[in-house]
Regions:
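Active-site neighborhoods and metal-handling regions in enzymes and metal-associated proteins
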Residues: 1-149
Length: 149
């Protein structure tokens, strides 16, 4: 609010442990424990436009498997961001990230879409999924998830 936000874009999500990988996971009575993945998903409305940001961290020290998962997801996200260009099908953008996740052995855990546009509404078109053949346009405001396995 101090910087001009007028509202939250959506209810903030905080999920730990197994629930940290669930799209739109909700908090339970489970206590956050050392070694848990913790996913925070939040956003605000500023000058009439929505934002949406997600971060996943490990509480305490990450083990080797957690580092592998984190780095795989990060690589998928950054590679897809680098690949996006006007004229590209949304399904192609999704495919860039999905291939990295699948090649790392986590494809069956990638049930959520890669991302979506944001604007006046928190979820706008185009969205990034294997079935969406909409084309990325100059001027789209895009959000690629990092919490998708």
């Amino acid at each position: 609010k101090k910087q001009g936000a007028t509202a939250l874009s959506f209810d903030t999500i905080s999920a730990s442990g197994i629930r940290s990988a669930m799209p739109h996971g909700i908090a339970t009575d489970k206590k956050i424990e050392n070694g848990d993945f913790l996913t925070l998903d939040f956003g605000c409305v500023f000058e009439g436009y929505c934002s949406d940001m997600t971060r996943t961290v490990v509480v305490g020290k990450a083990n080797d498997k957690q580092k592998e998962i984190y780095n795989t997801v990060l690589k998928a996200q950054t590679t897809a961001i680098d690949a996006i260009k006007a004229g590209m099908k949304c399904s192609e953008v999704d495919g860039v990230a999905r291939k990295i996740i699948t090649d790392a052995g986590y494809g069956e855990n990638f049930g959520h879409s890669l991302g979506h546009s944001v604007g006046i509404e928190i979820h706008e078109n185009p969205s990034f999924s294997p079935k969406n053949n909409a084309v990325v346009q100059n001027g789209n405001v895009l959000r690629l998830n990092r919490e998708f396995i």
